[in-house]
Regions:
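Conserved glycine-rich cofactor-binding loop
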Residues: 11-13
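Conserved glycine-rich Rossmann-like NAD(P)H-binding loop of the short-chain dehydrogenase/reductase
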Residues: 25-41
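The beta1-alpha1 cofactor-binding region of Rossmann-like NAD(H)/NADP(H)-dependent oxidoreductases
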Residues: 57-68, 94
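Substrate-binding pocket helix/loop in short-chain dehydrogenase/reductase
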Residues: 88-89, 96-98
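Active-site helix of classical SDR
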Residues: 112, 148
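Residue(s) in the substrate-gating loop at a strand-loop-helix junction
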Residues: 132
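SDR active-site lid
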Residues: 165-235
């Protein structure tokens, strides 16, 4: 059965791919983009693909944009919009930290609250929090970003428990290291302020972390997972993709319980 689905952050990456894929399958898709020029760009892509999309400006940190979004009756909300600020936790400017939380946590939660009210009143709906593998483990030099995703995991767990019996499903989607350009753009954010000569970080530690972005995975398997999650009834709460990343996360989580003073926590995630 066709559903009404809102995908935030639909201008690029997973959001764009998921919005187009769902529309191709006959769903009514509202594609939220951050700024007006992205409307024209996405409209052209959708037209070329022969796919009907309702595209609207939805900067999730903007109250006016959120209120306009609430005018849509939505069966599935896919909270995909997000940004990544990177850099050593001991050195990253606090303004960057606040900016990352403003979008990934506060904007996402504000949008979710409005649609949760709509869904509970109707007695049905699904809320999907896109939290990343970084919501379950912590990546060096992406600690602030991972903190925002850990926060979304906590909010999703609480929301699921609190909305029990209302007919509203809550689940998470946790992508591994996929080549959408998002990780690369995030890695570049620290270069605007980071000074290696005066850093607390040893160069070899930084270089080892940057190497983890090599050979990223093909995004299609994650887009397929988003489509499955949106369409199915009774989704699993947590959806880590691919399976190899899920197994790696379990190993990292188990290891943290036994880590000693001189032991390393981090190991590189599975890539392509």
């Amino acid at each position: 059965m066709a559903k009404r689905i809102l995908v935030t952050g639909a201008a690029t990456g997973f959001g764009r791919g998921t919005a187009l894929a769902l529309a191709k399958r006959g769903h009514t898709v509202i594609a939220g983009v951050q700024i007006a020029p992205q409307v024209t760009e996405l409209m052209k892509i959708a037209d070329e693909a022969g796919v009907p999309l309702k595209i609207q400006v939805l900067d999730i940190t903007d109250e006016g944009d959120r209120q306009a979004a609430f005018a849509n009756e939505v069966d599935v909300l896919i909270n995909n919009a997000g940004v990544m600020q990177t850099g050593p936790v001991a050195e990253i400017p606090m303004e960057n930290v606040r900016r990352n939380f403003e979008t990934n946590v506060f904007g996402t939660l504000a949008l979710t609250q409005g649609f949760a009210r709509q869904m509970v009143k109707r007695g049905s709906g699904k809320i999907v929090m896109v939290t990343s593998m970084g919501g379950l483990i912590t990546v060096p030099f992406a600690g602030v970003y991972c903190a925002t995703k850990h926060a979304l995991e906590a909010l999703a767990e609480a929301l699921k428990a609190e909305l029990a019996g209302t007919g509203v499903e809550v689940c998470t989607a946790n992508p591994g290291v996929y080549g959408t350009g998002f990780n690369d753009r995030g890695a570049e954010t620290m270069m605007r302020w980071f000074d290696m000569a005066n850093s607390l970080t040893k160069p070899e530690v930084l270089m080892a972390a940057v190497g983890g972005l090599a050979n990223q995975l093909d995004p299609q398997s994650m887009i397929d997972a988003f489509v499955r999650i949106a369409e199915e009834d009774g989704s699993k709460f947590r959806n880590v993709v691919p399976d190899e990343t899920a197994e790696w996360i379990r190993g990292v989580q188990a290891k943290t319980w036994e880590v000693g003073k001189d032991d390393a926590i981090w190991s590189s995630p599975p890539t392509g």
